[in-house]
C-alpha cells in the first residue's frame, strides 16, 4: 500500500486524576481512572486514518496489547507490520493529571516499543511501494536507524521529535 508508514509507539495509557502530582515519598488516592489506547505513534496513525489517509503502522506490542492493534485496524490502519512479541509487555504509561490545573506527569515503560530491530525494518522497507513516506516519533528505540535506512532506500522521512532529547540534534 502506497501511503504513510508510521514507525511508532503503541502504549496502554493508565490515566489517573489526582488533586496534585505525587511527590517523592508520598502516597495519594486518585479521584479518577481510565485506560486508553496511546503512544505518540498510535495516536498519529489513528488521526491519519480518521483524516482519510492511507496509513500502515509499524511497531511492536506484547500479547497484552492486541486490543491496540484491533482498534487501529477498525479505524482502517494497515496493521500487518505490527509485531506481537510474546516475551515482552506492550509499552505503557502511567499518567497523573491534576484535576484543577490539567498539569500532568508521565512515567513511561517502553516495552515492545524498544523491540524494533534493523532486520524487521529491512523487511518493511522491502515491501514498501515507491512513493511511500516514513513518519517517525521519538518513543521507539530505533528512530535514528530508521531515518538512515529510509534515506538509503529513497523514502522521505517526517519526524515528530517528541519526546525531545538531545540525541535528536545528532541525527541525520
Name each region found by the language model:
Residues 1-10, 70-84, 96-172:
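Ribokinase/PfkB-type carbohydrate-kinase core domain
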Residues 3-4, 24-92:
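Substrate-binding N-lobe of the ribokinase-like
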Residues 13-17:
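Short N-terminal binding/cap micro-motifs at the start of the first secondary-structure element
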Residues 20-22:
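N-terminal glycine-/charge-rich "phosphate-binding" loop or analogous flexible N-terminal tail
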Amino acid at each position: 500500500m502506497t501511503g504513510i508508514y508510521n514507525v511508532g509507539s503503541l502504549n496502554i495509557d493508565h490515566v489517573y486524576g489526582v488533586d496534585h502530582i505525587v511527590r517523592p515519598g508520598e502516597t495519594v488516592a486518585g479521584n479518577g481512572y481510565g485506560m486508553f489506547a496511546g503512544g505518540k505513534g498510535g495516536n498519529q496513525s489513528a488521526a491519519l486514518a480518521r483524516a482519510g489517509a492511507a496509513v500502515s503502522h509499524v511497531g511492536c506490542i506484547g500479547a497484552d496489547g492486541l486490543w491496540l492493534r484491533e482498534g487501529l485496524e477498525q479505524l482502517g490502519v494497515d496493521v500487518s507490520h505490527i509485531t506481537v512479541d510474546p516475551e515482552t509487555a506492550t509499552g505503557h504509561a502511567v499518567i497523573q493529571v491534576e484535576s484543577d490545573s490539567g498539569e500532568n506527569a508521565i512515567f513511561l515503560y517502553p516495552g515492545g516499543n524498544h523491540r524494533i530491530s534493523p532486520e524487521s525494518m529491512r523487511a518493511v522497507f522491502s515491501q514498501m511501494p515507491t512513493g511511500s513516506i516514513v513518519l517517525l516519533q521519538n518513543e521507539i528505540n530505533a528512530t535514528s536507524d530508521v531515518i538512515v535506512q529510509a534515506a538509503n532506500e529513497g523514502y522521505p522521512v517526517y519526524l515528530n521529535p517528541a519526546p525531545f532529547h538531545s540525541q535528536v540534534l545528532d541525527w541525520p
